[in-house]
Swiss-Prot record:
This is 2-C-methyl-D-erythritol 4-phosphate cytidylyltransferase. Gene3D superfamilies: Spore Coat Polysaccharide Biosynthesis Protein SpsA, Chain A. Disulfide bonds: none annotated. One of its GO terms (molecular function) is 2-C-methyl-D-erythritol 4-phosphate cytidylyltransferase activity. The gene is ispD. Its EC number is 2.7.7.60. Keywords: Isoprene biosynthesis, Nucleotidyltransferase, Transferase.
Length: 227
C-alpha cells in the first residue's frame, strides 16, 4: 500500500461489479476485456496500491479471476444492495467506492480523494460539464439547461465508512433507490467535496465506449500510470 500520511485507520476499496452489462451486450461487464485485461482487473490494479484491501461484489456463478489482489463477495440485485453488502464485509475506517467499468484511474485522483475525505468525510471525483445541455421532449429541443455550476459525477467516491453506512441505512429504511453513493450522503443534508476527476475516467457502458477504451488502453498501458 502506498502511504497516505493524512489518513488514520484502514482504507478499503469497494467495487460493485455484479451488473449484467445489458447495454454492452457481452455478459457481465466487469469481465469484458480491454487490451487483454478485464475491466475489473484494471480497476483492481489501479486501486490496490492505495488501500489496505480490495473487496469486489460479483454476480452469482462468476468467481474472482485468479491472481487479482482482492476478495470477492456475492453481489446484490442492484448496485445499491451490492455496496451495502460490501460495507458490511469490511471494518475499514475509510472506503473508496469505484465502478469496475471505469478502468483508467489515475493515482492523482485517488490521492486527492483520500485527502478530501480526511477533511469532509465524503468526496467524489467529478468534472465540470463542458457540453451544451438541453432538455428534450419527444425527440425535439425543448429548453437550454445552463451548464454553469454543473458537474458530471465520476468514481471513485471516498467516504468515512460509518457515514456511508448511515446514509445507506436511511435509504433502505425509506425505500429510496439510488445509483450513486455520494447522492445518498447529500440526501442527508451532509457535505460532499467535489474533487477534480479525469476525462479518462469515462464509464464503459456501450459498444462505442468499449471501442474508445481499446484505443485509450494502448496509450495508458504504454505510460503505465502508477503511484
Amino acid at each position: 500500500m502506498t502511504s497516505v500520511c493524512f489518513l488514520a485507520g484502514r482504507t478499503a476499496a469497494l467495487i460493485p461489479a455484479a451488473g449484467s452489462g445489458t447495454r454492452l451486450g457481452r455478459g457481465p461487464k466487469a469481465f469484458v476485456e480491454v487490451a487483454g485485461q478485464s475491466l475489473l482487473a484494471r480497476s483492481v490494479a489501479a486501486l490496490a496500491p492505495w488501500v489496505d484491501e480490495v473487496l469486489v461484489a460479483l454476480p452469482e456463478g462468476f468467481p474472482l479471476p485468479p491472481g487479482l489482489p482482492a476478495q470477492a463477495i456475492l453481489g446484490g440485485t442492484t448496485r445499491q444492495e451490492s455496496v451495502w453488502r460490501l460495507l458490511h464485509a469490511t471494518t475499514a475506517d475509510v472506503v473508496l467506492v469505484h465502478d469496475a467499468a471505469r478502468p483508467f484511474l489515475p493515482g492523482a485522483v485517488v490521492t486527492a480523494l483520500l485527502e478530501a475525505v480526511s477533511e469532509t468525510g465524503a468526496a467524489t471525483a467529478a468534472l465540470p460539464v463542458a457540453d451544451t445541455l438541453v432538455r428534450g421532449e419527444r425527440g425535439r429541443w425543448a429548453d437550454l439547461v445552463p451548464r454553469e455550476g454543473l458537474w458530471a459525477v465520476q468514481t471513485p467516491q471516498a467516504f468515512r465508512r460509518a457515514l456511508l453506512l448511515r446514509a445507506h441505512a436511511a435509504a433502505r429504511a425509506e425505500g429510496f433507490g439510488a445509483t450513486d453513493d455520494a447522492g445518498l450522503i447529500a440526501r442527508l443534508g451532509l457535505p460532499v467535496r467535489l474533487v477534480p476527476g479525469d476525462a479518462r475516467l469515462f464509464k464503459v457502458t456501450t459498444p462505442g465506449d468499449l471501442a474508445l477504451a481499446q484505443a485509450v488502453a494502448a496509450v495508458w498501458d504504454a505510460t503505465c500510470d502508477a503511484p
